[in-house]
């Protein structure tokens, strides 16, 4: 829908036909783009599996590729965090857009006794969120994209419970239109590292809480993820922030910020399975990605017997 609106605006500006095009289609359309000799570069956003498919197929046909894949974004909470503000940022990150965005925070990693302080504040604020039509005033969590997505998200919640987690907030039966594809904000605590809800991208309003003993354990846990898109740390310690940003294997880091996406003049930068390619989206990387460079060496013999060289 967003793309459709953007292209309607572009049409209203009087751009010549064919300068930009919106093409909808399935695998045949995608393969045609990836293989066409008339297309020099491909930029993709989607799941890790499809990102790898796009990257490998387009690269095999000599194209420049940037492929943004999946994510499992961790939000690390230290005991000295300002819990009220931390809870607000976590809620916005995890449940905004019903968790259906690559920068959604989906795992809280609490150090020491931080969960004891955070839990009552976070649970109280989450319970106040209203589920319903996202266009209605006062609604905090809208629908997920389809019935199939709803079923998939609910199955992850059940799997989390089967793997030993408990529900701090149960969003399986939200008070919303039963004909819609709704899942309420859900918080699973007691999640064990290595389980499905701890490792896999759910892409819904489900938040997993993992408790660890030390800062060392927290950093190690984040770095075991196959993804490296974004992460946040909540603390008032500058020393902890410096260590975290130096040691964590993630492309975008937020400090007391729930959604660690930078403004667009900085690169949008994932690592590991979150990104395939050399030049990232946004910033100077994006300019370089869509630029072909030439270096010209020339000389003019009228400047002297051997000429004078110029490099442009």
Regions found by a protein language model. Name each.
Residues 19-50:
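Active-site phosphate-binding strand-loop segment of PLP-dependent enzymes
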Residues 16-19, 41, 48-192, 215, ...:
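ALDH superfamily catalytic-core signature
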Residues 1-30:
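PLP-dependent aminotransferase-like
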Residues 4-5, 34-35, 53-57, 120-121, ...:
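Short amphipathic alpha-helical segments
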Residues 15, 39, 76, 130, ...:
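Conserved C-terminal structural/oligomerization subdomain of aldehyde/semialdehyde dehydrogenase
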Residues 1, 27-29, 48-50, 60, ...:
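Short alpha-helical
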